[in-house]
Amino acid sequence: MENNILELRNVTKEYDGQVVLKGISFNVKEGEFITLLGPSGCGKTTILKIIGGSQKPNSGEILFEDKNLIPIPINKRQFNTIFQSYALFPHLNVFDNVAFGLTIKKTKKDIIEREVMRQIRQVGLEGYENKKIDELSGGQKQRVAIARALVMKPKVLLLDEPMAALDVKLRKTMQEELKRLQQDIGITFIMVSHDQEEALSMSDRIVVMNQGTIQQIGTPEEIYNEPENAWVANFIGSSNIITDGIFLEDNKIKFDGKVFECIDTNFGENESSIDIIIRPEDIIIKNPNNGFFNAKVIKTTFKGIHWEVVVETSKKRQWIIHTINEYDIDQQVSIKWKPANVHVMWKEVDN
């Protein structure tokens, strides 16, 4: 995945005078699975529409295989889109839905038969080719939509929240299948999602967006473990964010009257324009007087695979902790963490 198949350079978009994309720039590598992740209204779907050709940017460049993509009409772009609604034809059976694009192109019948059945087998629907769409489950409909897109042999597949309509269990299954399929066929996938867990589990890289801007680009591990600002840290899972700490010097921070080790460097000396993040799963609950701070349990919530425990220290700071152990309200404990689990970042600057 060395070559950039797609490049966006300072792309902007306005609707009725409202700026919805504010200078978006990122590259997509050939064969990469990249997710545009963010809350509703952040601009991620607008980017997908601009890449697909149904909308044009107000300014900026988009290069596909080093050529200007913007003037190329939709039907000439080597992309296919899978919509949240799947946009299947209810009056056609599975085979004819998958074959639709090839039929419109007047492809020879023997080629249609071969290519359609190959894709139907690829998505695990062999034996369903004569079924009507309304006879299929949600997951099967999604497989038809995927086969219909892939039969056209696009170089890039665009996915607009493709699993949003599925129930939780089926969504997990389809996430695994879609990732496996992408790895098997090796083409570039660009997916829009508001689901953090989905993006973390499926993507090679994630573009995190908010209010028309890119907050961070990175691998799932980078996004989760090294968020670039407090907004990303809060959006990607729960976080304990210390906003009043001080970066004393390389590998040393201070808050609530105590000095702690960290692995961060290059934030200067006695620097207060920083935030400190410690993830809930990285905090260890110990017996009183065995940790950095003594604390009292003030809330517990069972989350299925772990307990979410909220404790409060004598400094009145509250900490969210994820643990497999159950604790009682008002129980006295102490908390501790490892230096590698402390993450320092610059405070966000309001422009």
Curated annotation (Swiss-Prot):
Record keyword Metal-binding present: no
Keyword ATP-binding on entry: yes
CDD domains found in the cross-reference section: ABC_PotA_N
GO molecular function: ABC-type putrescine transporter activity; ATP binding; ATP hydrolysis activity
Membrane topology type: Peripheral membrane protein
EC number from the UniProt entry: 7.6.2.11
PROSITE patterns, sorted: ABC_TRANSPORTER_1, ABC_TRANSPORTER_2, POTA
One GO term describing the cellular component: ATP-binding cassette (ABC) transporter complex
Primary localization class, coarse: membrane
Catalytic reactions on record: ATP + H2O + polyamine-[polyamine-binding protein]Side 1 = ADP + phosphate + polyamineSide 2 + [polyamine-binding protein]Side 1
Pfam families (UniProt xref): ABC_tran (PF00005), TOBE_2 (PF08402)
Subcellular location: Cell membrane
Domain of life where this protein originates: Bacteria
TM stretches of this protein: none
Residue intervals of the ABC transporter domain: 6-236
Residues binding ATP: G38, P39, S40, G41, C42, G43, K44, T45
Entry keyword set: ATP-binding, Cell membrane, Membrane, Nucleotide-binding, Translocase, Transport
Family membership: Belongs to the ABC transporter superfamily. Spermidine/putrescine importer (TC 3.A.1.11.1) family.
Assembly mode: The complex is composed of two ATP-binding proteins (PotA), two transmembrane proteins (PotB and PotC) and a solute-binding protein (PotD).
Function according to Swiss-Prot or TrEMBL: Part of the ABC transporter complex PotABCD involved in spermidine/putrescine import. Responsible for energy coupling to the transport system.
NCBIfam families given in the database record: MMSYN1_0197
PANTHER family cross-referenced by the UniProt entry: SPERMIDINE/PUTRESCINE IMPORT ATP-BINDING PROTEIN POTA, SPERMIDINE_PUTRESCINE IMPORT ATP-BINDING PROTEIN POTA
Protein name listed in UniProt: Spermidine/putrescine import ATP-binding protein PotA
Organism: Mycoplasma capricolum subsp. capricolum (strain California kid / ATCC 27343 / NCTC 10154)
Organism taxonomic ancestry: Bacteria, Bacillati, Mycoplasmatota, Mollicutes, Mycoplasmataceae
